[in-house]
Curated annotation (Swiss-Prot):
Assembly and interaction partners: Component of a trimeric complex composed of STK11/LKB1, STRAD (STRADA or STRADB) and CAB39/MO25 (CAB39/MO25alpha or CAB39L/MO25beta): the complex tethers STK11/LKB1 in the cytoplasm and stimulates its catalytic activity.
This protein's name: Calcium-binding protein 39-like
InterPro entries for this protein: ARM-like, ARM-type_fold, Mo25
Described purpose of this protein according to its UniProt entry: Component of a complex that binds and activates STK11/LKB1. In the complex, required to stabilize the interaction between CAB39/MO25 (CAB39/MO25alpha or CAB39L/MO25beta) and STK11/LKB1.
SUPFAM superfamilies: ARM repeat
Length: 337
């Protein structure tokens, strides 16, 4: 029986699709009169590529064609070009690129993830995506692809241990709310998804990271301030981060900052600050400077906590924690001379 060809005359094979896409992206890059036709060809090629990777309603993706397309994307450098030229592609095309990128990233052969291996050896792809936060028309698309990359520990590690990681502290403060929120979602993902990796990263880079982090906790932007406080609470209460927590709660300047945030004008900020403050007070191994601050403010703190957010009548855990902290502060004694 004669074997049917994988691609009919009307359907281009992966190598042809990749070549047409590359050629037309090159035309778009020149920004000359031929761009309309090129833009149309780019859209068609992206659709064809998506069809191979995702299949159609009645057909599963053809394994052989998917493998060919993946190989072409790597060998031609098109995966890099698609990110580099994302701003030149129309709205629907940007969505297609995101879908193609995330689909090819999830592809596995046994236990191997070929695209993860490819990006690991071409890490500038990650930094191009990260820099996308600086371009409003592609920022959210880059965020989606970046978070898909972060699901894979080797790629998360490259970003965490890079100089570019610190750019997040700038991006989460951007004036465009959608972009700043998306950047924070990616930032949070990086710091919470791979627990052992993150603990190692924070231990190695404690001073630098927490110096930057403190600025977020004092941000003029309410959302940034609240999200950062909430994330800090999650980080120091995670058992993997015990060393980081111990270091953080040993420093008097951190306790002073939380005591100030307990008096913030926003009840939500106060509440998030409470969840960090309680770790200082509840710790059985307080450093002497911490004990001294708590003793110096002992009567004020007891009075303050007694009436702190009394309106939270339905939150039993909060009431129990508050009573526990009041008892801990009341029982503090000056060290014997």
């Amino acid at each position: 029986m004669k074997k049917m060809p994988l691609f009919s005359k009307s359907h281009k094979n992966p190598a042809e699709i990749v070549k047409i896409l590359k050629d037309n992206l090159a035309i778009l890059e020149k920004q000359d009169k031929k761009t309309d036709k090129a833009s149309e060809e780019v859209s068609k090629s992206l659709q064809a590529m998506k069809e191979i990777l995702c299949g159609t309603n009645d057909k599963e993706p053809p394994t052989e064609a998917v493998a060919q397309l993946a190989q072409e994307l790597y060998s031609s450098g098109l995966l890099v070009t698609l990110i580099a030229d994302l701003q030149l592609i129309d709205f629907e095309g940007k969505k297609d690129v995101t879908q193609i990128f995330n689909n090819i990233l999830r592809r596995q052969i046994g236990t191997r993830c070929p695209t993860v291996e490819y990006i690991s050896s071409h890490p500038h792809i990650l930094f191009m995506l990260l820099k996308g936060y600086e371009a409003p028309q592609i920022a959210l698309r880059c965020g989606i692809m970046l978070r898909e990359c972060i699901r894979h520990e080797p790629l998360a590690k490259i970003i965490l241990f890079s100089n570019q990681f610190r750019d997040f502290f700038k991006y989460v403060e951007l004036s465009t709310f959608d972009i700043a929120s998306d950047a924070f979602a990616t930032f949070k993902d990086l710091l919470t998804r791979h627990k052992v990796l993150v603990a190692d990263f924070l231990e190695q880079n404690y001073d630098t990271i927490f110096e930057d982090y403190e600025k977020l906790l004092q941000s003029e932007n309410y959302v940034t301030k609240r999200q950062s406080l909430k994330l800090l609470g999650e980080l120091i209460l995670d058992r993997h981060n015990f060393t980081i927590m111990t270091k953080y709660i040993s420093k008097p300047e951190n306790l002073k900052l939380m005591m100030n945030l307990l008096r913030d004008k926003s009840p939500n900020i106060q509440f998030e600050a409470f969840h960090v403050f309680k770790v200082f007070v509840a710790s059985p191994h307080k450093t002497q400077p911490i004990v001294e601050i708590l003793l110096k403010n002992q009567p004020k703190l007891i009075e303050f906590l007694s009436s702190f957010q009394k309106e939270r009548t339905d939150d039993e855990q909060f009431a129990d924690e508050k009573n526990y902290l009041i008892k801990q502060i009341r029982d503090l004694k000056k060290a014997a001379p």
